[in-house]
């Protein structure tokens, strides 16, 4: 920021930091773009359904109506959050199975680009938790589920139900509402994290995985896996545009 202030002072005789910051904000807003929207809008579906078989293909999950609907619900929730920030999506897709099965890798590759994925959200009561959400689309909660208690699960349930964060960045004078553009996935070795009450359970969408039944390991050919998942998103986008899935 110091170099920008010096540049504007030398070249434009602007010396007010407040005016320079306001000008930068205006120019940035006039030239903003959304890289995730751009990628999703560029996808062309080849017409082959993959959502139903996706989790079986990579992780050996059952190829069932339940698994298909849970993954579809997650994908459409993620798409809505990008195109309609703050859209209501209160659930977490939870992949349940042994270590080394590729659960975290699945979420990472599903985010399309690695920088749009994060597994760095460790504490929900951190004042700077918003920094862990900025710029990320799919956020995996693994350690929190692994060390869950009744209290922590209630905190997770409350956290994933929010539609916005309210905070002030270093160059802003007042806090602002930031509508959420991310969704949350979970991974666990067991189902022990699930609350016993039905109200708590409905926030978590568990899918059992059986890696020995998978058709391929997701890292066997990462390029092929990424191409497959792009077509999964393309299929989901076709559903989104059809308006037939609420």
PLM segments and residue spans:
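Feature primarily recognizes SF3-like P-loop helicase cores of small DNA viruses
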Residues: 9-34, 88, 115-119, 125-152, ...
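P-loop NTPase catalytic core of nucleic-acid-dependent motor ATPases
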Residues: 24-134, 138
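Non-catalytic nucleic-acid substrate-recognition regions in nucleic-acid-modifying enzymes
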Residues: 1-9
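Short amphipathic alpha-helical segments and helix-helix/interface helices
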Residues: 107, 156-157
